[in-house]
Amino acid sequence: MKEVIDTVGRRKTSVARVFMSPGKGRVIINKLPAEEYFRDEVKRQQALRPLALTEKMEDFDIKVNVHGGGVSGQTGAVSLAIARALTEFDESARAVLKKEKLLTRDPRMVERKKFGRKKARKRFQFSKR
C-alpha cells in the first residue's frame, strides 16, 4: 500500500488535489487549517463528510490544494477528492460513499450567456407597442 495517496476532485470550475496519509486527523487546506479556510461550519462539514461517514476522521492527515471557483464549488471538489482517496485506502468504504453519492462527479456547470439575451435564458423586456 502507498504511504501517500493523491487524488483529484472537481466541481464547477474548482479543482482540488488531496494528499492523504495515515496520521492524527489534521486537515490542511491551502496551508490553512480546515477551520480557518472554511469558516462556515456547514461548508466545512460538507467538505469533510466522507471522513465523517466512514468514521475515519482521526485516522488520516490530509493536505489539500484547491483553486478556482467559489466556496460552494471548492467544497464539492474537496469532498469528491477525499472520497476518492478513502476508497484507494479502504475498498470497504466504497459502498458507504457510493450510497451517499459522494463518488459521483456533479456534471452541472454554468450555462453560457447567449447573444441577443440578457443572461443565459432571460430575455430583454418585450414591448408590444
Curated annotation (Swiss-Prot):
Recorded GO MF terms: RNA binding; structural constituent of ribosome
InterPro entries hit by this protein: Ribosomal_Su5_D2-typ_SF (IPR020568), Ribosomal_uS9 (IPR000754), Ribosomal_uS9_bac/plastid (IPR023035), Ribosomal_uS9_CS (IPR020574), Ribsml_uS5_D2-typ_fold_subgr (IPR014721)
Keywords: Ribonucleoprotein, Ribosomal protein
SUPFAM superfamilies referenced in this protein's UniProt entry, alphabetically: Ribosomal protein S5 domain 2-like
Ribosomal protein recorded as keyword: yes
Pfam families recorded: Ribosomal_S9
GO CC, one annotated term: cytoplasm
Alphabetical GO biological process terms: translation
UniProt record similarity statement: Belongs to the universal ribosomal protein uS9 family.
Alphabetized HAMAP family for the sequence: Ribosomal_uS9_B (MF_00532_B)
PANTHER family from the UniProt entry: RIBOSOMAL PROTEIN S9 (PTHR21569), SMALL RIBOSOMAL SUBUNIT PROTEIN US9M (PTHR21569:SF1)
Name of the protein in its database record: Small ribosomal subunit protein uS9
Source species: Chlorobium phaeobacteroides (strain DSM 266 / SMG 266 / 2430)
Origin organism lineage: Bacteria, Pseudomonadati, Chlorobiota, Chlorobiia, Chlorobiales
Gene name for this UniProt entry: rpsI
